Each structure stands twice: as structure tokens, then as C-alpha cells.
From Swiss-Prot:
The lineage of its organism: Eukaryota, Fungi, Dikarya, Ascomycota, Saccharomycotina. ATP binds at residues 16-18, 73, 205-207, 271-278, 342. It catalyses: ATP + H2O = ADP + phosphate + H(+). Pfam families: HSP70. This is Ribosome-associated molecular chaperone SSB1. It comes from Eremothecium gossypii (strain ATCC 10895 / CBS 109.51 / FGSC 9923 / NRRL Y-1056) (Yeast).
Length: 613
């Protein structure tokens, strides 16, 4: 890579199943990886020798299911006891353990048992995306805009930002995926001067968002947003996998539930069948020797696939209804419905949505896999002020808080301070008081959600305001100030009005949050892993070079014509040097340097032996 640092920033769509990276240099470019693919699997695999990320990791998943990690986005910012984490764990071949309430992924790597946080796994994927960009740009990349589902809560946003820091990136902004896709649409096929209401329907591999925007010139105003951070293509695959599993059991009497390799192979076949059924109405599925020597062969129709996933497909319309209701807009006022995310290729999903909008033609002009990274790259260029075109220099994004924020009052009742769909950044205040006479400390538990009872919402963290004057209950005036930044991340301050005493919290001490020390430690670990990866690659290369050289010299020695050209008595020296090179290849612990020395040693002897007499 050329020296120097890229002055701009890259846009990264960190997806549940696939990720995508783009850069903006006078126009947007989606960058392909070394396999030539414009999307890279969000997979990380650990082996006794090395760590693999992306295509290489996904390609060996069936051979190494226990140590191939994916779906980190379904763990990030969640607690171990989260209902969705517990249900996902039943389908994942890798092990997830409880570390003080946070989920950690346990794998075997370099012959040891290691555990990684979801942030570290995501950081490995981000590092891969950063390297893909660096290979194209030819400079070191330090800054990025990373996208998250619009419906991600505070904990999930902060954890994604932390993953960026572990990957050595300065995360300039966390932006919402549907908003990024709206930029791609507004600058591309949807370019128009007139004001319009655009609904972005973003159904990806693991998450689902619906956002309603008003686009007027270069101003993108999000009116409302809704979604499900646990719905996507993976769930459709899982339902199909369960169907195939039951069919295999019926035919053979065998249950593959406990066999991680068979499950991975069948899941891959299910994913392939799902994709095929978007363009044909029937397909066959064949997996040779799936389990205990038994082959699996079946055919599946599009209608059956739709039936298996009917409830999930239908559930995608609920957030659509919600955003219209929240924005107080009727469906007839929506000018365009834009499809984003690979799962919107499913014909049934398109039909349900089109029918909901009275047969409206859906907007399929943008690439559903690349639109989010495209929008992120535009935002990255705006934030770094690099090479903006006329279209982008006046672009303004006004996004919203996806979920209400507030504190718990007596009786665990949720007191909302910032209602959902409030434009961010924002500052809101609300006054509270004491409930007991002489009370000098008040605890502020901060929650995010829409329910009246706090236990049904997400606890983001809590803090104490101490030193309140001991007055009768109800007299002290305590003001809670909620501040949400452009990343959708919250800071809360409480002030006692008569003394001016303050206490604050940037929600970062809740369960699963990483302290700056944790992040620093993970950054240095990430660098160590990267160094180990590089050392492994160098060793592998050096070994291959030595092997091919040894093999060519062996041929020379055994060829009577060629060996006759050697100096007298030199053949035995060459044979001895060959034996030394062989022993270097036999030693497991040989380093790249050992192989290099063995190759140089052998070359010297051969050169002397072949020197003209």
C-alpha cells in the first residue's frame, strides 16, 4: 500500500450477513473485495493456524462450524438474557457464553480457547472492509461513517461505534441504514426538484427498518421510523431449514439437530433455494451424504416457501402502518416506495407491499445490496468536506430518535422526556422532585422504549444525584436534561436547581458497555491478531517457495543429464543441503525466516555445484 493517509472517509454498511464498503471521490464507488465481490460475508472463522474473514471464512463454514462466527450484529449491544439472544443460540453452531450479563463468543483459535465480544467480531469485519478500501485507494484509511438499523437502540449504536474504534477507525458518524439508502435514491434514480414523501422499506439479512422521509431538494427529513432489529433473510432461511430437517427425518428417521456440519450444509442449501425461488417457481435441493451417509433430495415450490414464511412476510407490514400513523400521513400521500436490502427481492414481500399501497409500482431502481454503503459514502464525503459535487454540497440530513427516552418514576412508571421520532440532535428537559422528606439522593434509571411499565422497556443505565438539600418531599426541583447527538447516542444530566449540583451519564456504564480501557485493550489485541495473520501468510508463502524450489532441485539431481553438469563431488553436497531443507519443512514451528534461510542455503550450494567447471 502506498504511504500516506486518505484525507476523506469511507462509508461502511456493516450488515448481519453481508457488508459493503464505498468511497466518494467526485462520485461514489462501491469497492469490490479481492474475490471481485461487491459485498463481503460478515463471517469470521478461527482455525488452529489462522483467522479468516469474509468469503474465505464463509466458504469453510461447513468444515469448521463451531469456530465460524456470523450474526454478530444480532448480539451487539444486547444482554445475554435477551429473549432473541436465547432463541438465536439454539440455531447457532458456535458457543455463546454469559460474561457478567453480556454475551461472549467462545472459539478455539491457535490451539487455545478464546472468547470475543460481539464488538470484537464486528471490528474484525470492519477491519476487513477497511483493508478492501485501502487496497483500492492505495492509502491508509482512518475515518469512516458506519450504518446501523434505524431501529437500533442506544446500547446497539454505542457498541457499533466501539467496534469501529477497535478496528482503528475514527467513526465520524453512525447513520441509519434507510436514511443512507434514501440519499442513494435521491441522488440517483429519484433525483427531482419537487418535494415528495418517500417510504424506504429495508429488509436485509437480519434486520428490518421502515422509514418515511420528506425529500425536498437536498433536504432529507425523516418523519418517522419503525422496524424490527430481529427480522430478515436469516429467519426465512431458518424456517426453510426446519422444514427440510423435518422432511429428512420423515424420509430417513434421522434427526440432524445435533450435527453442526450437517446443519450448516443444509442451511447453505436452504439459502440457495430461497434465492433461486425469487426468479423461478420451483427448485430442487440436493445435499450428498448429508448425515450418516444418507443423501437429501427434495423439490420445493415458491408457493410452499411463501407458506412456510407467511407469518413473517405478513409481519413486515406492521411497521409500514406504524410509520404512516406516526407521521400522520395516509398511504395515498406516499409518492414512492423504495426497496432496499437483499430480502426485498422475494416476490411475495413485494406483492404484499404493493397490495398494501393499492397496487402501487415499487421503486427498484437502486441496488438493494449497495444503496446503504452508497449513502454512507456520501455522508462521509460531506463530513470530511471532500470533492463534493453540486448535488451533494447542499445535502442536509435530519434524522430522528427511533425510540422514546425517559426515566423511571415511582411505581416503575416510564416518564418520557424525548418522544420517539423527535428530530436529532435534540435537547429536552423535564422536572422531577423527591418522594420522601429529607431525601438527599435521587437515582435516575434511564430507559428507552414505548411501554408504560419500565420493566417492558430497555434499561440503558442509571446514575445518582447526591447532595440534595434535605427538604420536605416534593419541594426540591430536580431537572433532567436529555441530549441526543447526531449518532442517536444519549447523554443525560440532572441538576438540583437551588444548589446547582449536577450529575451526568453518557450512557456507557450499562451492561455490556465497553470502557475506554476495554476498547484500548481490544485495539491492541486486534493489532496482535492482524500481525499473527500477516506472519501466518508470510510463513505460508515462504514454505510454498521452499517446497517448489526443493522439488525442482530434486528433479535436477535425479535427472542424469542435468546432474552430470554438476562439479565433481558436488552432488553429495546438494543432496545434503536438500536433506537440510527437508528437515526445515518437517519442523512444525519453522518460521518464515527459517524457510527463507533454508532456501538461501540450498541455493548457495546449488549455484556452486552448477558453476562452470
Amino acid at each position: 500500500m502506498a504511504e500516506g493517509v486518505f484525507s476523506g472517509a469511507i462509508g461502511i454498511d456493516l450488515g448481519t450477513t453481508y457488508s459493503c464498503v464505498a468511497t466518494y471521490e467526485s462520485s461514489v464507488e462501491i469497492i469490490a473485495n479481492e474475490q471481485g465481490n461487491r459485498v463481503t460475508p460478515s463471517f469470521v472463522a478461527f482455525t488452529p493456524e489462522e483467522r479468516l474473514i469474509g468469503d474465505a471464512a464463509k466458504n469453510q463454514a461447513a468444515l469448521n462450524p463451531r469456530n465460524t462466527v456470523f450474526d454478530a450484529k444480532r448480539l451487539i449491544g444486547r444482554r445475554f438474557d435477551d429473549e432473541s439472544v436465547q432463541s438465536d443460540m439454539k440455531t447457532w453452531p458456535f458457543k455463546v457464553i454469559d460474561a457478567n450479563g453480556s454475551p461472549m463468543i467462545e472459539v478455539e483459535y491457535l490451539g487455545e480457547t478464546k472468547s470475543f465480544s460481539p464488538q470484537e467480531i464486528s471490528a474484525m469485519v470492519l477491519t476487513k472492509m477497511k483493508e478492501i478500501a485501502e487496497a483500492k485507494i492505495g492509502k491508509k484509511v482512518e475515518k469512516a461513517v458506519i450504518t446501523v438499523p434505524a431501529y437500533f437502540n442506544d446500547a446497539q449504536r454505542q457498541a457499533t461505534k466501539d467496534a469501529g474504534a477497535i478496528a482503528g477507525l475514527n467513526v465520524l458518524r453512525i447513520i441509519n441504514e434507510p436514511t443512507a439508502a434514501a440519499i442513494a435514491y435521491g441522488l440517483g434514480a429519484g433525483k427531482s426538484e419537487k418535494e415528495r414523501h418517500v417510504l424506504i422499506f429495508d429488509l436485509g439479512g437480519g434486520t428490518f427498518d421502515v422509514s418515511l422521509l420528506n425529500i425536498a431538494g437536498g433536504v432529507y427529513t425523516v418523519k418517522s421510523t419503525s422496524g424490527n432489529t430481529h427480522l430478515g433473510g436469516q429467519d426465512f432461511d431458518t424456517n426453510l431449514l426446519e422444514h427440510f430437517k423435518a422432511e429428512f427425518k420423515k424420509k430417513t428417521g434421522l434427526d440432524i439437530s445435533g450435527d453442526a456440519r450437517a446443519l450448516r450444509r443444509l442451511r447453505t442449501a436452504a439459502e440457495r433455494a430461497k434465492r433461486t425461488l425469487s426468479s423461478v417457481t420451483q427448485t430442487t435441493v440436493e445435499v450428498d451424504s448429508l448425515f450418516e451417509g444418507e443423501d437429501f433430495e427434495t423439490s420445493i415450490t415458491r408457493a410452499r416457501f411463501e407458506d412456510i414464511n407467511a407469518a413473517l412476510f405478513k409481519s413486515t407490514l406492521e411497521p409500514v402502518e406504524q410509520v404512516l400513523k406516526d407521521a400522520q400521513i395516509s398511504k395515498s400521500q406516499i409518492d414512492e416506495v423504495v426497496l432496499v436490502g437483499g430480502s426485498t427481492r422475494i416476490p411475495k414481500v413485494q406483492k404484499l407491499l404493493s397490495d398494501f399501497f393499492e397496487g402501487k409500482q415499487l421503486e427498484k431502481s437502486i441496488n438493494p445490496d449497495e444503496a446503504v454503503a452508497y449513502g454512507a459514502a456520501v455522508q462521509a464525503a460531506i463530513l470530511t468536506g471532500s470533492n463534493l459535487s453540486d448535488d451533494t454540497k447542499d445535502l442536509l440530513l435530519l434524522d430522528v430518535a427511533p425510540l422514546s427516552l425517559g426515566v423511571a418514576m415511582q411505581g416503575d412508571v416510564f416518564a418520557c422526556v424525548i418522544p420517539r421520532n423527535t428530530t436529532v440532535p435534540t435537547i429536552k428537559r423535564r422536572t422531577f422532585t423527591t418522594v420522601h422528606d429529607g431525601q438527599t439522593t435521587v437515582t435516575f434509571p434511564v430507559y428507552q422504549g414505548e411501554r408504560v411499565n419500565c420493566k417492558d422497556n430497555t434499561l440503558l443505565g442509571e446514575f445518582d444525584l447526591k447532595g440534595i438539600p434535605p427538604l420536605p418531599a416534593g419541594e426540591p426541583v430536580l431537572e433532567a436534561i436529555f441530549e441526543v447527538d447526531a449518532n442517536g447516542i444519549l447523554k443525560v444530566t440532572a441538576v438540583e436547581k437551588s444548589t446547582g449540583k449536577t450529575a451526568n451519564i453518557t450512557i456507557s456504564n450499562a451492561i455490556g458497555r465497553l470502557s475506554s480501557e476495554d476498547i484500548e485493550k481490544m485495539v491492541s489485541q486486534a493489532e496482535e491478531f492482524k500481525a499473527a495473520d500477516e506472519a501466518f501468510a508470510k510463513r505460508h508463502e515462504a514454505r510454498q517457495r521452499l517446497e517448489s524450489y526443493v522439488s525442482s532441485i530434486e528433479q535436477t539431481v535425479s535427472d542424469p543429464v542435468l546432474s552430470a553438469k554438476m562439479k565433481k563431488g558436488a552432488k553429495s553436497k546438494v543432496e545434503a543441503a536438500l536433506a537440510d531443507a527437508f528437515s526445515a519443512l518437517q519442523i512444525e514451528e519453522s518460521s518464515a525466516e527459517d524457510y527463507r534461510k533454508a532456501e538461501i542455503g540450498l541455493k548457495r550450494v546449488v549455484t556452486k555445484a552448477m558453476a562452470t567447471r
